[in-house]
């Protein structure tokens, strides 16, 4: 199952303004190489398919979305080349309130299949979440209260449905497709719905004989924990059995033949394949397969999806479209080509042109801007990227005066950054209110020329008792203090 991260300590840190920093040009960077992703030079962006008819497995590999495929891979390729419709799934345990950006990589695999006519299933671990997956962990998880788990299940269900709905809309818009072009079918599932009726003795009698303890002990997630001081609880030891049965159940009841997960899920996925092959006659259904995605890291070696030590979440109640836009806008130059391949449906020729344009003037952040707009559109709906770009331009001093006050208020409310003030307030008091400083400190900021009003390039050096001339449509004031603080205020 996908690992989620705690949503605590996020809101304040993720919304702060991130100052622009200067990165070296792409032409001077040697991008990281691995067997998952290879980039000999910034200009050699190759491999993403320009055709919907090309083998989807090859395209996913070329985009850096595939790490391992269970054997025989040739059989899977034959099915895909024959235009057979397949059904695949990915599981998520409700260990946090929201999915984070790092969870998107396996979900992008499902999305690629989905938009090209294949059926997909997501399984939320309402049952397995009670047990806890030891994969990739050195210690056992803390026990979660049942009501919190149920709340997480409900939240994640909405996030998954929103992701595939918006993702399909984004794909159709990006590829200029009409709605009559068929996609696959999306089916959400909760494994509690089948586990609640299974009795332990019946399960052991029917399935225990097909599960080999020697294979369980040999898996990395188990063997590594057995070497630690605290060892491994029986609950976590049996987790792979539960996930294996999930795959078997979906294979038998819903004709699901592929499970997708992170690299740390390889042992759990192959456990399911082993169980299916031992129980279910292969002649009745297609072979079961597993596909894993690589752990995505940045050019600096950090886990992708982190911002100042906190994960960036896709739940709009936690992180807004503007938050996600800013996260991708601050992508390192070296990561732009890779992230364009993984998180967008841009084809190879489009990505190559973007990179070439970016190299000419890296300081303009052309590549980051397009990346941020594409991902924001995919996650929050088409148009969210352009809105976030417009808001970013205002906040970072690039406002051209074309947006109405009503549009500004709407954008800022969605980003949850709109401030309010009495229209009779003078500038000194307004500065004190916004930055929580003394009157003398506010006067000092004015005298130093650190204060700007509206989108004027001229500095304000003295107190202003009447701010009406600086309002947009007699309603909104833009106040900048220094290089990193910008406030958009609705005057009432």
Swiss-Prot record:
<keyword id="KW-0496">Mitochondrion</keyword>
<keyword id="KW-0648">Protein biosynthesis</keyword>
<dbReference type="InterPro" id="IPR002307">
    <property type="entry name" value="Tyr-tRNA-ligase"/>
</dbReference>
<dbReference type="GO" id="GO:0070184">
    <property type="term" value="P:mitochondrial tyrosyl-tRNA aminoacylation"/>
</dbReference>
<dbReference type="GO" id="GO:0003723">
    <property type="term" value="F:RNA binding"/>
</dbReference>
<protein>
    <recommendedName>
        <fullName>Tyrosine--tRNA ligase, mitochondrial</fullName>
        <ecNumber>6.1.1.1</ecNumber>
    </recommendedName>
</protein>
<dbReference type="InterPro" id="IPR001412">
    <property type="entry name" value="aa-tRNA-synth_I_CS"/>
</dbReference>
<dbReference type="InterPro" id="IPR014729">
    <property type="entry name" value="Rossmann-like_a/b/a_fold"/>
</dbReference>
<feature type="short sequence motif" description="'KMSKS' region">
    <location>
        <begin position="303"/>
        <end position="307"/>
    </location>
</feature>
<feature type="short sequence motif" description="'HIGH' region">
    <location>
        <begin position="94"/>
        <end position="103"/>
    </location>
</feature>
<feature type="binding site">
    <location>
        <position position="243"/>
    </location>
    <ligand>
        <name>L-tyrosine</name>
    </ligand>
</feature>
<dbReference type="InterPro" id="IPR036986">
    <property type="entry name" value="S4_RNA-bd_sf"/>
</dbReference>
<feature type="binding site">
    <location>
        <position position="306"/>
    </location>
    <ligand>
        <name>ATP</name>
    </ligand>
</feature>
<keyword id="KW-0030">Aminoacyl-tRNA synthetase</keyword>
<keyword id="KW-0436">Ligase</keyword>
<dbReference type="Pfam" id="PF00579">
    <property type="entry name" value="tRNA-synt_1b"/>
</dbReference>
<comment type="similarity">
    <text>Belongs to the class-I aminoacyl-tRNA synthetase family.</text>
</comment>
<feature type="binding site">
    <location>
        <position position="246"/>
    </location>
    <ligand>
        <name>L-tyrosine</name>
    </ligand>
</feature>
<keyword id="KW-0067">ATP-binding</keyword>
<feature type="binding site">
    <location>
        <position position="133"/>
    </location>
    <ligand>
        <name>L-tyrosine</name>
    </ligand>
</feature>
<feature type="binding site">
    <location>
        <position position="89"/>
    </location>
    <ligand>
        <name>L-tyrosine</name>
    </ligand>
</feature>
<dbReference type="GO" id="GO:0005524">
    <property type="term" value="F:ATP binding"/>
</dbReference>
<comment type="function">
    <text>Catalyzes the attachment of tyrosine to tRNA(Tyr) in a two-step reaction: tyrosine is first activated by ATP to form Tyr-AMP and then transferred to the acceptor end of tRNA(Tyr).</text>
</comment>
<dbReference type="GO" id="GO:0043039">
    <property type="term" value="P:tRNA aminoacylation"/>
</dbReference>
<feature type="binding site">
    <location>
        <position position="265"/>
    </location>
    <ligand>
        <name>L-tyrosine</name>
    </ligand>
</feature>
<keyword id="KW-0809">Transit peptide</keyword>
<dbReference type="GO" id="GO:0005759">
    <property type="term" value="C:mitochondrial matrix"/>
</dbReference>
<dbReference type="GO" id="GO:0004831">
    <property type="term" value="F:tyrosine-tRNA ligase activity"/>
</dbReference>
<comment type="subunit">
    <text>Homodimer.</text>
</comment>
<dbReference type="GO" id="GO:0005829">
    <property type="term" value="C:cytosol"/>
</dbReference>
<dbReference type="InterPro" id="IPR002305">
    <property type="entry name" value="aa-tRNA-synth_Ic"/>
</dbReference>
<dbReference type="GO" id="GO:0005739">
    <property type="term" value="C:mitochondrion"/>
</dbReference>
<keyword id="KW-0547">Nucleotide-binding</keyword>
<dbReference type="InterPro" id="IPR024088">
    <property type="entry name" value="Tyr-tRNA-ligase_bac-type"/>
</dbReference>
<feature type="binding site">
    <location>
        <position position="93"/>
    </location>
    <ligand>
        <name>ATP</name>
    </ligand>
</feature>
<feature type="binding site">
    <location>
        <position position="239"/>
    </location>
    <ligand>
        <name>L-tyrosine</name>
    </ligand>
</feature>
């Amino acid at each position: 199952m996908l690992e989620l991260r705690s949503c605590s300590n996020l809101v304040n840190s993720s919304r702060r303004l991130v100052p622009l920093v200067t990165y070296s040009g792409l032409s001077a960077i040697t991008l990281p190489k691995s067997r998952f992703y290879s980039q000999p030079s910034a200009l050699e962006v190759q491999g993403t398919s320009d055709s919907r008819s090309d083998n989807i497995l090859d395209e996913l590999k070329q985009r850096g979305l595939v790490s391992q495929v269970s054997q025989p891979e040739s059989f899977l390729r034959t099915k895909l080349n024959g235009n057979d419709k397949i059904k695949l799934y990915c599981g998520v345990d409700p260990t946090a309130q929201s999915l984070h950006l790092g969870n998107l990589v396996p979900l992008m695999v499902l999305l690629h299949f989905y938009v090209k006519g294949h059926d997909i299933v997501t399984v939320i671990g309402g049952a397995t979440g009670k047990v806890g997956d030891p994969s990739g962990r050195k210690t056992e998880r803390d026990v979660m209260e049942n009501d919190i788990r149920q709340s997480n299940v409900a939240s994640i269900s909405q996030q998954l449905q929103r992701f595939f709905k918006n993702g399909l809309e984004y794909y159709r818009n990006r590829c200029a497709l009409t709605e009559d072009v068929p996609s696959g079918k999306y089916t959400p599932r909760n494994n509690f719905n089948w586990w609640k009726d299974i009795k332990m003795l019946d399960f052991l009698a029917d399935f225990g004989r097909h599960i080999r303890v020697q294979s369980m002990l040999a898996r990395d997630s188990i063997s590594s924990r057995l070497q630690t001081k605290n060892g491994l609880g029986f609950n976590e030891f049996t987790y792979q059995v539960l996930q294996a049965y999930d795959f078997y159940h979906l294979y038998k009841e819903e004709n699901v033949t592929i499970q997708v997960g992170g690299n740390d899920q390889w042992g759990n996925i192959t456990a399911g394949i082993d169980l299916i092959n031992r129980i279910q006659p292969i002649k009745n259904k297609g072979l079961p397969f597993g596909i894993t995605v690589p752990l995505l890291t940045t050019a600096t070696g950090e886990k992708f999806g982190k911002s100042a030590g906190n994960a960036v979440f896709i739940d709009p109640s936690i992180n807004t479209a503007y938050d996600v836009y800013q996260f991708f806008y601050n992508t390192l130059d070296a990561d732009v080509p890779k992230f364009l391949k993984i998180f967008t449906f841009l084809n190879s020729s489009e990505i190559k042109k973007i990179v070439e344009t970016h190299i000419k003037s890296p300081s303009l952040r052309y590549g980051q801007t397009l990346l941020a707009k594409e991902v924001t559109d995919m996650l929050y709906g088409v148009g969210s990227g352009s809105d976030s770009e417009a808001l970013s331009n205002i906040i970072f001093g690039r406002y051209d005066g074309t947006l109405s006050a009503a549009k500004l208020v709407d954008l800022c409310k969605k980003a949850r950054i709109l401030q309010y003030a009495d229209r009779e307030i003078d500038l000194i008091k307004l500065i004190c209110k916004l930055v929580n400083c003394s009157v003398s400190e506010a006067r000092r900021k004015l005298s130093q020329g650190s204060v700007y009003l509206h989108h004027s390039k001229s500095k304000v050096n003295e107190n202003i008792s009447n701010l009406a001339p600086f309002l947009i449509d007699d309603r909104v004031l833009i106040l900048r203090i220094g290089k990193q603080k910008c406030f958009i205020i609705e005057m009432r």
